[in-house]
Amino acid sequence: MIVALKPGVTQESREQLMDWLQNLGLHIHVSEGEYQTILGLVGDTTKVDMDLVASLDIVDSVKRVTEPFKCCNRKFHPEDTVVEVGDVKIGGGNFCVMAGPCSVESEEQIVAVAKAVKASGANMLRGGAFKPRTSPYDFAGLKAEGLELLKIARQETGLPIVTEIMSVVDLPLFEDVDVLQVGARNMQNFDLLRELGKLRKPILLKRGLANTLKELLMSAEYIMASGNEQVVLCERGIRTFSDYTRNTLDLAAVPMLRELTHLPIIVDPSHATGIARLVPPMALAGAACGADGLIIEVHNDPMHALCDGAQSLRPEEYVKLAEKVRGIREVIGK
C-alpha cells in the first residue's frame, strides 16, 4: 500500500501517522521527493482502513500495490535511486562503466588492464576471483589471492573494484571489496541474498539465464527487505532458441525495468554475446536504450586468457568503444 502525504506536512504529524501504522505490524519505507513524501507500507495491509487513512488531513491519496515486489517498486519510490561507490554514482542520470578482465590471472595482468581502462574513462574495475564455471575442469579463479590482486590494482589506479561472490561462507573475504556481484547462476540463491541484505555495500545483481523480470525484482526484494537498498540490476542476456550468440541480450528489459523499479540498471554486452566483435554494437545499443551503465570485459591478451577470451576486448578496442559510448550519450541528451 502507498500513502502519499500532502506537501508541507510537519514532521510531528508524519511521525504520528507512522507510529500508528507501525503499531499495526507494518514496515514503512519513506521516500521523500522534492514536492511530496510517500510512505510505502509492507506487511498485512488488510488491517488498514483505506478510507480512514485517506480521510486524514495530511494524506493526499492511498493506493494498493498489487505487485509482489515492494521495496524496489517505483510506486513506493518514484525518484531514481542513486547508488554511490566512493565518488562514483550509478543511476539518476549518472552513467557508470565497469571494465576489466573476466578473471584475475596475475598482478601484472590486472594492474595493466586497470590502468588501461582508467585512462579511457572507466569508473570501476571488474575482475573475477571466484568463477562459477560450467565445467569442473575449467579455471575457477584465483579465489582469495585474486581478491588481493584486485586490491593492489585499486591501490595503483584508485578505481573501485567489483567482483563476484558465490557463497555465504566466503563473505569474510569480501569485507574490503567495494561492490559485490551476484552472478546469473546465483540470482535465486536466497540464503546468499539475505546475507547480502545485511551488509552496507552496493550489490550488483545479474539477471539469471532464464529468469523473468519479476523474478529478478523479487531477488532484489530479498536484498532490500533485509536492509540493504544499494542494489544495481544487470541485464546480461537470457537463453533462447537462438544459437548464433551465447545468449540473447534483452534490451527491452531496460526501459521496462525503468517503469517498474527505481533501481539503477546496467547492461553486460560481453556475456550476452560471447563474441568480442559484437560487444561494441550491443554496448552502444545498451547506452542508447537508457541503461545507467555498462560492464565490459577487457583483457590485454585475449588469445591467452584463462577465461572468456573470445568475448574480451583488447585495451585499444575498449578505448574506441568508450569514445563512441560518450557520443551516444550526447546524442540521447544524457
Model-derived segments and spans:
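Alpha-helix-loop-beta-strand connector modules within alpha/beta enzyme cores
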Residues: 139-163, 195-202, 251-265, 311-333
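Non-catalytic terminal accessory/regulatory regions of metabolic enzymes
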Residues: 1-97
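N-terminal small/glycine-rich loop or linker at the start of catalytic domains
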Residues: 83-102, 133-136, 258-267
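Glycine-rich, proline-tolerant flexible connector loops at the mouths of alpha/beta enzymes
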Residues: 126-144, 300-312
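Hydrophobic faces of well-ordered beta-strands that scaffold small-molecule active sites
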Residues: 96-101, 123-127, 161-163, 180-182, ...
